[in-house]
């Protein structure tokens, strides 16, 4: 499905945190747009909200199950306003969607710089005691520190790079070997 085609009806089954400008742009993509401001309580509520919509938007707080989708045969597209890394980690039944010709997309690689900035700033606060008691009696630098990173995806890789920039020794755990990380 080309998501630039016009939909009949777009339903955001829960708050999806769109800025007002982009919420307005949704109206150019469908004849009708319905945005719910609360989190649905179960599959029946979700199915009722979707109704005859052909486009569904959701965030990370609700699950779009096979049971709910089966009650809504018009669904052609599900937009996850959150991360989609794998069918196993998704809050949408990706396998059901694929088997029924429903296109599902999510967001990848967003906010990574902010995550890295937060991790580095909190580590510096902890090591130096800025605004809180210091980790040890004497402030420490990141240089020479042994840092472990769990998960070497986009954010984890950027955190490892930032720590390496400051002179830390990096160790990581990931589901598979990361040759690029080993070479750094």
Question: Where are the language model's segments positioned?
Answer:
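N-terminal glycine-/charge-rich "phosphate-binding" loop or analogous flexible N-terminal tail
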Residues: 1-55, 167, 171, 179-180
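Phosphate-coordination loops involved in phosphoryl transfer and adenosine-cofactor binding
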Residues: 7, 75, 143-146
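Short beta->alpha connector loops
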Residues: 15-18, 38-41, 59-64, 83-86, ...
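Rossmann-fold NAD(P)-dependent oxidoreductase module
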Residues: 25, 118, 158, 162
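Structural alpha-helical scaffold elements that stabilize or flank donor/cofactor-binding regions
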Residues: 26, 48-49, 68-71, 141
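Acidic, amphipathic alpha-helical patches
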Residues: 43-46, 65-68, 138
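Phosphate/diphosphate ligand-binding glycine-rich loop within oxidoreductases
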Residues: 54-134
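Rossmann-like dinucleotide/phosphate-binding beta-alpha-beta segment
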Residues: 138-184
């Amino acid at each position: 499905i080309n998501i630039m085609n016009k939909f009949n009806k777009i339903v955001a089954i829960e708050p999806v945190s769109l800025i007002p400008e982009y919420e307005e742009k949704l109206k150019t993509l469908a004849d009708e747009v319905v945005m719910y401001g609360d989190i649905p309580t179960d599959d029946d509520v979700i199915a009722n909200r979707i109704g005859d919509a052909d486009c569904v938007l959701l965030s990370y707080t609700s699950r779009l199950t096979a049971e709910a989708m089966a009650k809504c045969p018009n669904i052609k597209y599900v937009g996850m306003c959150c991360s989609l890394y794998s069918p196993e980690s998704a809050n949408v039944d990706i396998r059901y969607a694929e088997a029924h010709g429903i296109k599902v997309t999510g967001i990848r690689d967003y906010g990574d710089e902010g995550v890295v900035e937060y991790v580095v700033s909190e580590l510096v606060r902890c090591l130096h005691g800025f605004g809180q008691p210091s980790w040890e009696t004497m402030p420490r630098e990141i240089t020479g520190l042994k840092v472990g990173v769990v998960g070497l995806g986009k954010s984890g890789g950027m955190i490892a790079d930032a720590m390496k920039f400051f002179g830390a020794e990096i160790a990581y755990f990931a589901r598979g070997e990361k040759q690029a990380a080993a070479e750094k």
